[in-house]
């Protein structure tokens, strides 16, 4: 049954966001404009002050009132677009000014009613009927009103939709489930574009729905439960439960106290699955047959009556993963909705028993949806009214009441959708389809309503005349029009009749807010018929006030028929001076002004602009006078300076300029000096910081040095280890070579044995062969030794000859020195004329002592006949030789002829290690490499009385001979060694004589023997 009139009045202003036809009175739209002449009270549309005219941005972007006629739908559609940047020409009278511009209607439509192009012709034919219909309120037929209201039957709707869904094929069912699942991610109806990016809408859930995070969490949990714990029969049953959820949602079974609907639908699906289950069928049939309740004959007789769908011969198969995912999502959201519904029911107080079915989830979500919309639009300090005027909080006193009314309307819309969602969706679909159809029909001549410019209309022939806005200024509106001539006008152009217009006359005139506008100029485009341009007329409406809304009507000049009407709002002026000088117009109402008011405002605006222009002209004139007088004075000054100026004056000016530059330079230099002084004085803080940094740097440097020392020590240790390892490696290599040599000898012996055995020799012959081989080796060795002995003997003989020569030279030199000294002493005179001084002992008294001293010290003199001999260098071997009783002097006379072939004294180094030992490389160079020229001036004396019989080592002699091959001595360098047994292996580091008599100076035979090589 229809609701009461009070309820109808409350819901009359409701904007059904999705085109839902709610319960209420049928709205009757008037066909003519009753606001042009100020007759607002005669309007049949019930209003409650400004609240019925304001459209909030959050609810008017995609919303319209329930529209009973297609004409009203088209009118609503044509007035729903705004633009804030681009001001271009639009066809069919649809104009855009600035962002403040309101709705523009086309083809004879004013802001309150819109009609198609055909309505203008029909209104021309029946003007009286239209005016009569506009002046009276249409009566409402109760039967027609009752037929437009659907009774809420959620149980029937839900069951019907469930039966319909169960009969669909699997592919269609999958598509339906996908569409239904996608609806959970859609934004709420009536939400603005700003609310889509609101954090509240995304995470808190708009329109009572759970948040995105909650949905994802529930889907994941249900999917895990689906894959782990549900078998095939349970999965197929869950798929049909998803169909139940879709049917309950579309049929409204979840609203109010409809728990019975849910249980009934679930029971139907459960019974169907139990009947279709093969296991249950086998169990029931087996139990009936075993209990003999039904005989097999009776069962086979009536089994053909059971539908084929119920007779399963094979078990059910698992559903596809696509259907499983969709079913999991739908069931998860159903469980979430049930939980939210129970929580809201527990929190909310007990509702009064009014008999109304209320969806607690939808009612709880209405507040959420409104809050989210209010959050997204709370930052707006003003909004746009129906006339394009910005309504600020200062001028809008009842803003809170409007918020409350919008809140109530949104809650009512949610309640209507929750009661009859399926039929509401059908009604919304119908309204949307009809709206698009009327829209395409109304704009079929202009490329289906797309925004077009004059360039897009080149070459397009239009049947009816069209007028469109090309530019909107603060005080002017420019428009263009097509060709208004018709074939009837062309046929009757020869006869000038009343109502017919010539080609040069204006085919239409302009009315602004119902008053014919005298300042509107219309001009014909020259040569418009010759070309293909659609523009035939251009015009301009001037004398308008800025920031005001106007309804511009274009009327035919011959029939006074209205061509089109549009609502345009002029933008605010951008000139700050004009805004400050011109008084602001009174606050416009929410309806167009009357013609008288419009004309008065236009006159006031024109006078204000005229006064402003006059004041500006006067101000500009005064400014120009001042500028001209100033320029004249400057010109006279320059002329005077030009005529009176001389070279002297120019030089003075130049000197003054230079002095000025010098002064500026000095000031700059002083400033730079102060800066330098400031820079030289180091602040204490920086100095302390520098000291700290320096100490830190020194510590780090010490640490670095210590680390470097540690590194060097580590490297040296590693180097020592490496050297020791290398020495070990060398010794190992030598041992390996010896072993390899031994192995070679053993192999040779083995081969000889093998060869001997192979030749059949006996053991005696083999031993004889070995003995013969040994004898041959010994013979070779003996021959080698004999050769070495012969060479050594020859070398000894050569050394003896050279030694004799050296002794003879030494004796001659000593005799010459003694004779020279004696001659000097004999011929010497006293140093003073008086003779020898008292207390002195002349040398002549003791000639024997002096001669003995000279004779003794002669060999140690380092200057002999102008030759400088190097001083004798002490050697550690001299100390070693002194231990065996060797003397440091050589008292032997040169006349003695020592027998060098007698016994040599035993060397103290006779027990020294072999020269092949490792310490052989550290031998003193003075023992092995003496210069051969040193034998010319001295020779190491050898005491023959202390010598043992001469013996030598052949191996040592051979090695010494090889080492002395690079010496400067001409004679052979043989290492002689006094030994007690023939061919001993023990050698001395200082045994033998030097390389070819390379010893120097005189000395004791023991020391010479110790220094010999």
Swiss-Prot record:
GO CC, any one term: membrane
Coiled-coil portions: 597-806
Membrane topology: Multi-pass membrane protein
Compartments, as annotated in UniProt: Membrane
Transmembrane regions listed in the UniProt entry: 159-179, 212-232, 255-275
Family: Belongs to the acrB family.
UniProt superkingdom: Eukaryota
Region Disordered, residue ranges: 1-65, 104-139, 342-367, 574-599, 878-906, 954-1013
UniProt protein name: Probable ubiquitination network signaling protein acrB
Polar residues compositional bias, start-end: 33-64
Ranges of biased composition (kind: Low complexity): 1003-1013
């Amino acid at each position: 049954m229809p609701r009461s009139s009070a309820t109808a009045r409350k819901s009359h202003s409701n904007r059904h966001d999705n085109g839902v036809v709610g319960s209420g009175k049928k709205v009757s739209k008037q066909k003519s404009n009753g606001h042009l002449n100020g007759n607002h009270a005669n309007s049949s549309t019930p209003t409650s002050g400004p609240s019925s005219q304001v459209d909030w941005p959050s609810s008017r972007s995609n919303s319209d009132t329930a529209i009973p006629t297609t004409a009203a739908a088209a009118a609503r559609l044509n007035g729903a677009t705004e633009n804030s940047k681009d001001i271009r020409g639009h066809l069919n009278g649809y104009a855009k000014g600035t962002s403040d511009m309101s709705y523009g209607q086309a083809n004879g439509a004013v802001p309150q009613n819109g009609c198609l192009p055909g309505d203008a012709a029909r209104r021309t034919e029946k003007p009286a009927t239209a005016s009569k219909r506009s002046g009276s309120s249409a009566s409402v037929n109760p039967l027609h009103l009752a037929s437009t209201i659907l009774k809420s039957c959620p149980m029937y709707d839900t069951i019907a939709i469930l039966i319909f869904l169960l009969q669909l094929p699997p592919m269609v069912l999958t598509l339906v489930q996908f569409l239904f699942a996608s609806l959970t991610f859609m934004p709420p109806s009536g939400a603005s574009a700003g609310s889509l990016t609101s954090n509240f809408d995304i995470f808190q859930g708009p329109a009572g729905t759970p948040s995105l995070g909650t949905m994802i969490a529930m889907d994941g949990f249900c999917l895990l439960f689906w894959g782990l714990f549900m078998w095939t029969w349970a999965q197929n049953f869950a798929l049909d439960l998803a169909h139940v959820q879709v049917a309950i949602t579309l049929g409204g079974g979840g609203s109010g106290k409809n728990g019975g609907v849910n249980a009934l639908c679930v029971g139907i699906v459960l019974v169907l699955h139990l009947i279709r289950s093969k296991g249950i069928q086998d169990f029931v049939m087996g139990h009936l047959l075993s209990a003999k309740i039904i005989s097999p004959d009776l069962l086979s007789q009536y089994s053909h009556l059971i539908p084929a769908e119920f007779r399963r011969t094979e078990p059910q198969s698992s559903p596809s993963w696509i259907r499983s995912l969709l079913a999991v999502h739908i069931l998860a959201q159903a469980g979430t909705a049930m939980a939210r519904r129970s929580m809201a029911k527990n929190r909310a107080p007990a509702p009064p028993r009014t008999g109304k079915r209320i969806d607690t989830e939808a009612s709880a979500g209405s507040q959420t949806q409104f809050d989210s919309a209010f959050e997204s639009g709370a930052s707006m300090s003003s909004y746009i009214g129906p006339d394009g005027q910005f309504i600020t909080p200062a001028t809008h006193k009842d803003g809170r009441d409007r918020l409350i009314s919008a809140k109530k309307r949104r809650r009512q819309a949610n309640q209507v959708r929750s009661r009859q969602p399926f039929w509401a969706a059908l009604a919304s679909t119908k309204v949307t389809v009809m709206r698009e159809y009327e829209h395409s029909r109304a704009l079929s001549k202009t490329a289906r309503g797309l925004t077009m410019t004059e360039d897009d209309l080149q070459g397009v022939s239009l049947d009816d005349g069209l007028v469109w806005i090309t530019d909107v200024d603060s005080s002017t509106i420019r428009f263009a029009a097509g060709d208004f001539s018709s074939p009837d006008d062309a046929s009757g152009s020869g006869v000038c009749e009343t109502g017919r217009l010539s080609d040069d006359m204006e085919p239409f005139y302009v009315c602004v807010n119902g008053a014919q506008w005298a300042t509107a100029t219309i001009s014909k485009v020259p040569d418009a018929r010759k070309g293909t341009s659609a523009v035939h007329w251009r015009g301009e409406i001037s004398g308008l006030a800025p920031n005001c809304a106007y309804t511009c009507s274009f009327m035919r000049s011959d029939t006074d028929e209205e061509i089109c009407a549009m609502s345009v709002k002029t933008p605010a002026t951008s000139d700050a001076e004009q805004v400050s000088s011109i008084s602001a117009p009174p606050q416009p109402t929410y309806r167009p002004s009357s013609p008288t008011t419009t004309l008065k405002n236009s006159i006031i605006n024109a006078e204000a602009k005229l006064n402003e222009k006059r004041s500006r002209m006067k101000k500009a004139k005064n400014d120009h006078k001042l500028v001209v007088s100033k320029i004249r004075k400057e010109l006279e000054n320059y002329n005077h300076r030009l005529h009176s100026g001389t070279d002297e004056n120019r030089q003075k000016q130049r000197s003054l300029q230079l002095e000025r530059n010098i002064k500026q330079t000095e000031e700059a230099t002083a400033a730079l000096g102060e800066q330098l002084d400031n820079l030289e004085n180091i602040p204490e803080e920086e100095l302390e910081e520098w000291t700290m940094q320096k100490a830190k740097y020194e510590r780090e440097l010490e640490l670095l040095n210590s680390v470097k020392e540690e590194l060097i020590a580590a490297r040296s240790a590693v180097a020592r280890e490496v050297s020791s390892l290398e020495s070990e490696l060398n010794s190992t290599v030598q041992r390996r070579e010896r072993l390899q040599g031994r192995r070679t000898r053993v192999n040779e012996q083995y081969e000889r044995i093998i060869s001997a055995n192979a030749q059949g020799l006996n053991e005696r012959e083999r031993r004889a062969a070995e003995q013969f081989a040994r004898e041959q080796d010994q013979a070779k060795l003996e021959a080698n030794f004999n050769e070495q002995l012969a060479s050594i003997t020859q070398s000894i003989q050569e050394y003896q000859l050279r030694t004799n020569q050296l002794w003879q030279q030494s004796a001659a030199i000593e005799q010459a020195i003694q004779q020279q000294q004696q001659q000097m002493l004999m011929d010497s005179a006293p140093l003073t004329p008086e003779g020898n001084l008292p207390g002195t002992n002349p040398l002549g008294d003791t000639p024997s002592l002096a001669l003995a001293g000279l004779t003794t010290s002669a060999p140690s003199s380092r200057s002999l006949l102008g030759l400088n001999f190097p001083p004798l260098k002490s050697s550690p071997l001299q100390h070693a030789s002194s231990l065996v009783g060797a003397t440091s002097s050589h008292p032997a006379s040169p006349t003695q002829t020592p027998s060098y072939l007698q016994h040599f004294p035993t060397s103290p180094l006779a027990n020294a290690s072999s020269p092949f030992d490792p310490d052989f490389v550290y031998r003193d160079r003075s023992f092995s490499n003496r210069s051969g020229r040193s034998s010319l001036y001295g020779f190491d004396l050898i005491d023959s009385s202390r010598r043992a019989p001469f013996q030598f080592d052949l191996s040592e002699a051979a090695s010494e001979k090889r080492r002395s091959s690079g010496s400067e001595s001409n004679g052979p360098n043989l290492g002689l060694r006094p030994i007690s047994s023939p061919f001993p292996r023990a050698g001395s580091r200082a045994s033998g004589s030097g390389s070819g008599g390379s010893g120097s100076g005189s000395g004791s035979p023991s020391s010479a023997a110790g220094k010999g090589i």
